[in-house]
């Protein structure tokens, strides 16, 4: 990989880790930025290197479930980005049966962290939770569609420097009597007709988790044309 010295680059998107160059079709890794700022123009002096891996694939490679968060709120701009990403998710017949509740109040996050005995407690330390709901009256594939939207939140979070973790709610129990859905429904005043698929805990990670190596991936579960024929890389 070779580095290039580039100045006065028109930028369409800037994140904490990556930039996209207007007129180009390649994503780059940022090395040095901001040389000077004028009233109507920002001059960037960058050393950049081209990446062989497409940005979307790189995001998937890096994404890990994050359960420990820094005590820092997620900026409104980033919350807007997450919501837009989820709203752009595909759905069966374009019916979009999802509804999202953005939770930032610490007291509510603490209550939601008790939605089930295990696997949700870390939500109390997250600065942001997205309750992913679906309307069965709008689509019989609401489970699939809200699951796709849940993943959109997680991938978008990774791409803008946040970490996150899926908390399964549907078909889980708060205790021996009350379902996790019923528990959350009462706290957040969710109508009976609306189902709850998941909660996505989001925030800035305390520490990064190394990506899984390619050797760790379960390629033995991949087949070619027929179930008994293993797919060879």
Walk through the language-model features, giving the residues of each.
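Acidic, surface-exposed loops and disordered segments
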Residues: 25, 36-37, 42-233
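N-terminal low-hydrophobic presequence detector
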Residues: 4-6, 18, 30, 63, ...
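A cross-taxon signal for low-complexity, glycine/charged-rich
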Residues: 24-25, 31
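Low-acidity, Ser/Thr- and Arg-rich intrinsically disordered low-complexity segments
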Residues: 2, 7-18, 22, 36
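Low-complexity, intrinsically disordered or signal/transmembrane-proximal segments
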Residues: 3, 31, 45-47
């Amino acid at each position: 990989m070779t580095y290039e010295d580039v100045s006065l680059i028109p930028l369409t998107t800037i994140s904490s880790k990556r930039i996209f160059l207007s007129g180009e079709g390649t994503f780059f890794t940022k090395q040095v930025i901001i040389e000077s700022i004028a009233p109507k123009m920002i001059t960037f002096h960058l050393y950049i290197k081209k990446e062989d891996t497409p940005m979307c694939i790189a995001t998937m490679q890096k994404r890990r479930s994050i359960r420990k968060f820094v005590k820092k709120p997620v900026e409104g701009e980033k919350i807007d980005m997450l919501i837009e990403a989820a709203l752009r998710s595909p759905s069966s017949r374009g019916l979009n049966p999802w509804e999202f509740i953005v939770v930032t109040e610490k007291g509510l996050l603490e209550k939601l962290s008790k939605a089930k005995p295990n696997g949700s407690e870390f939500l109390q330390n997250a600065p942001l939770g997205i309750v992913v709901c679906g309307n069965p009256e709008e689509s019989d594939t609401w489970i699939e569609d809200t699951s796709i939207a849940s993943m959109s939140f997680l991938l978008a979070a990774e791409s803008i420097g946040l970490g996150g973790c899926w908390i399964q709610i549907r078909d889980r129990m708060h205790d021996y009597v009350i379902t996790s859905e019923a528990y959350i429904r009462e706290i957040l005043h969710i109508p009976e007709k609306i189902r709850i698929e998941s909660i996505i805990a989001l925030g800035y990670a305390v520490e990064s988790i190394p990506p899984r190596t390619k050797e760790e991936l379960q390629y033995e579960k991949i087949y070619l044309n027929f179930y008994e024929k293993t797919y060879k890389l």
